[in-house]
Regions:
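Extended, charged low-complexity segments
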Residues: 229-296
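Cysteine-centered nucleophilic/redox motifs
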Residues: 73-100, 120, 214
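Linear, non-domain "peripheral" regions
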Residues: 1-12, 263, 291, 295-296
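Secondary-structure boundary elements
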Residues: 5-73
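Residues at alpha-helix termini
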Residues: 20, 91, 255-256
Length: 296
């Protein structure tokens, strides 16, 4: 079930979306095309949640998301960029389902407690592939088969581990320790389920309204800024460093939003409001332990 579905077919131009992500390959439902489209999107469209801290209510209909990401060259969160990718894949001929996931908070080492993430399941030639271009921290760029076998990519291992009633997306770096990304059910959801997520996060009392979060692939590394913490995932090693002042924030944002200068300006505006004195409004950040046990 497509969160961007409506009573009529999408009218936005597929050519423009594919130009936005720089994809020039064949438009046919093959694994090779799926991999190339996912790679092109992940490397071209930044992840960002700038709407919530600015009090902007995003529209999730197809035309609005397309306008934000393509003509206006914006980024987006899972409800936007994963939904846009799902719609594009369907128009090319892929069978795509959208399911709800519960994200793992890497800085706090716990799940959010909410089904607050959209994940795509692409059914192709008898295999189900997990696709996700809308997650802040490191996830696989390429589709991962839903078969529990480890999948190697850019110095990391990924797998989809089944439990009693959930599937846990996990990754392992050079230390060999499997850590969760999110968990989900193979249970396609209607559009209304995703509208509920949006409404929750836009309430002023939620942490998203006071959180600056953006991410991008850069020179083979995944850079994720979460308020005043920069999480860098590079060839199997993840590190967390503080971003202590506006100059450092500007440098990080310039790298994450390269070729998207308007997003740098907007993100710095959010930074100044959240950190007028370079103070962390949500308290100290727990260290990420290299000996963290695998979540059960």
């Amino acid at each position: 079930v497509d969160v961007m579905a409506s009573s009529t077919e999408a009218t936005w131009p597929l050519d423009a979306y594919l130009d936005r992500i720089g994809y020039r390959g064949p438009r046919e439902p093959t694994l090779s095309a799926l991999q190339d489209i996912c790679r092109a999107h992940a490397e071209s469209v930044p992840f960002e949640t700038l709407d919530a801290p600015e009090g902007v209510v995003p529209s999730l209909d197809q035309e609005s998301v397309f306008t934000k990401v393509v003509p206006r060259r914006g980024g987006g969160a899972c409800l936007e960029v994963n939904a846009l990718l799902a719609a594009a894949l369907r128009r090319i001929g892929f069978a795509v389902d959208t399911v709800l996931g519960e994200a793992w908070r890497v800085l706090e080492r716990r799940y959010t407690g909410l089904l607050d993430h959209m994940v795509l399941l692409v059914r192709l030639d008898g295999t189900t592939w997990v696709v996700d271009v809308g997650f802040a921290t490191l996830t696989p760029v390429l589709p991962v088969p839903l078969d529990s076998q480890p999948w190697r990519e850019r110095g990391w291992w990924f797998r989809m581990r089944p439990t009693d009633d959930l599937i846990v997306a996990e990754r392992a770096g050079t230390d060999g320790v499997w850590r969760p990304l999110y968990r989900f059910r193979d249970d396609p959801q209607p559009a209304e389920a995703f509208e509920d997520i949006r409404d929750h996060y836009l309430r002023r009392s939620t942490r998203m309204s006071r959180t600056l979060m953006c991410a991008r692939w850069s020179a083979g590394r995944r850079l994720t800024l979460i308020n005043d913490r920069l999480v860098t995932a590079d060839r199997g090693v993840e590190s967390v460093m503080p971003v202590g002042d506006e100059a450092q924030a500007a440098a990080v944002l310039a790298e994450i939003f390269r070729d998207h200068e308007h997003l740098v300006v907007r993100a710095l505006r959010v930074w100044r409001r959240l950190f007028p004195d370079q103070m962390d409004p949500i308290g100290p950040t727990p260290a990420v332990s290299s000996n963290e046990e695998r979540n059960q």
